Amino acid sequence: MAAIAIPENTRVFLLDIEGTTTPITFVKDILFPYIRENLEDYLSAHWEEDECKQDVHLLKKQTEEDLRQNKACHVHTVDQTVHTDEEKAIREVVENVLWQMAADRKTTALKQLQGHMWRAAYMMGRIKGEVYQDVVPAIRRWRHHGLKIYIYSSGSVEAQKLLFGYSVQGDILDLFDGHFDTNIGAKVESKSYENIAERIGCQPEEIMFLTDVTREAKAAEDAGVNVAVVVRPGNMELTEEERDHYRIITSFNQLELIGNV
């Protein structure tokens, strides 16, 4: 695809992760299977540690809330307090976590346990964050010209930092000026992008947001943010109307800093 000039007043790049800096398959094919395959061993190894106990406690609280909200639905319960049988208690937690993952739930309890497991895996070298080859050189070039780089992902800030801190290209956290997750707001709500601009200390129109999801692109655009939609292998197909409306790139290298130097 042809080069695309970014607006001259751009001061900040705001980057999505999944499908933008990182293959969309990384979470589905690497991170989630790691949880499923290693969950029981992880719990057995860390069961008596305070952090693990807190994770299990949150899962138990979530189960109680699920039962209160909809007693008719099938819920895998967690109740480690009544068991002296550690194996049985661990099995209950495993069943609950696998059930939540199969239902594609995003509960705080689930995300916290997953985050702790991924942290251990990254630190042991069992997982490395995948980053497209064009990403790091492009970011270095943008930074050289004085632009700031921020990440905005639905994954937690901690998960973001693990991915980039233990990436296939080494520790590249120094490339980023900050990280945002859904604590700042949902990615499909325009207010979130206004909040980010305010937090960074710039105007929305001074931000260039790169994402593969057009619902996010529209929300950012509605807030006055400039947008480019990233097309990578495995990303959702764009409609003809979307292709006509948005700047489309297949590589960060297509973005030219005309007037920004």
UniProtKB/Swiss-Prot annotation:
Pathway info: Amino-acid biosynthesis; L-methionine biosynthesis via salvage pathway; L-methionine from S-methyl-5-thio-alpha-D-ribose 1-phosphate: step 3/6; Amino-acid biosynthesis; L-methionine biosynthesis via salvage pathway; L-methionine from S-methyl-5-thio-alpha-D-ribose 1-phosphate: step 4/6
Chain residues that bind substrate: 153-154, 187
Any single Gene Ontology cellular-component annotation: nucleus
InterPro entries tied to this protein: Enolase-ppase_E1, ENOPH1_eukaryotes, HAD-like_sf, HAD-SF_hydro_IA, HAD_sf
Subcellular location: Cytoplasm; Nucleus
Enzyme Commission number(s) from the entry: 3.1.3.77
Cofactor remark: Binds 1 Mg(2+) ion per subunit.
Gene3D superfamilies membership: 1.10.720.60, HAD superfamily/HAD-like (3.40.50.1000)
Cofactor(s) required, per the database record: Mg(2+)
UniProt KW Metal-binding keyword: yes
Keywords assigned: Amino-acid biosynthesis, Cytoplasm, Hydrolase, Magnesium, Metal-binding, Methionine biosynthesis, Nucleus
BP term (GO), one: L-methionine salvage from methylthioadenosine
Catalysed transformations (reactions): 5-methylsulfanyl-2,3-dioxopentyl phosphate + H2O = 1,2-dihydroxy-5-(methylsulfanyl)pent-1-en-3-one + phosphate
Listed SUPFAM superfamilies: HAD-like
Pfam family name, one: Hydrolase
Record GO terms (molecular function): acireductone synthase activity; magnesium ion binding
Ligand binding (Mg(2+)): 16, 18, 212
Quaternary state and interactors: Monomer.
Function: Bifunctional enzyme that catalyzes the enolization of 2,3-diketo-5-methylthiopentyl-1-phosphate (DK-MTP-1-P) into the intermediate 2-hydroxy-3-keto-5-methylthiopentenyl-1-phosphate (HK-MTPenyl-1-P), which is then dephosphorylated to form the acireductone 1,2-dihydroxy-3-keto-5-methylthiopentene (DHK-MTPene).
Family: Belongs to the HAD-like hydrolase superfamily. MasA/MtnC family.
The protein, known as: Enolase-phosphatase E1
Organism for this UniProt entry: Danio rerio (Zebrafish)
Gene expressing this chain: enoph1
